């Protein structure tokens, strides 16, 4: 079983209906390579085809979880969480520009072995 995940700072061609980028845009290079040259599956896209789910406040999906097929068969659900976690918070010390735990939404994956 293999998994690769994180902030790729790139976008998936599968989401281009949202972005409207030219087909030769370099923003696709990372995911084009992963999808064309590795056994990894974009699990959020596979489980929610056509249902764009942003992973950042800016409205892009740049955080991904990729898995090989054997591990993907163990996935029961996967989703990007938009409730609760990114809610504004206050720092009692008055630190400025520190109002969110992250500028990315968490991705939750449930696996069953």
Language model region names:
Residues 1-3, 10-113:
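Metal-dependent phosphoester-hydrolase catalytic domains
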């Amino acid at each position: 079983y293999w998994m690769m995940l994180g902030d790729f700072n790139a976008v998936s061609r599968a989401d281009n209906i949202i972005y409207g980028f030219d087909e030769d845009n370099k923003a696709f290079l990372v995911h084009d390579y992963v999808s064309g040259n590795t056994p990894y599956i974009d699990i959020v896209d596979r489980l929610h085809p056509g249902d764009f789910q942003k992973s950042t406040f800016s409205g892009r999906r740049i955080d991904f979880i990729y898995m090989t097929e054997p591990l993907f068969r163990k996935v029961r659900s996967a989703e990007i969480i938009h409730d609760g976690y990114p809610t504004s918070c206050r720092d009692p010390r008055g630190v400025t520009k520190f109002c969110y735990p992250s500028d990315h939404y968490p991705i939750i994956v449930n696996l069953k072995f």
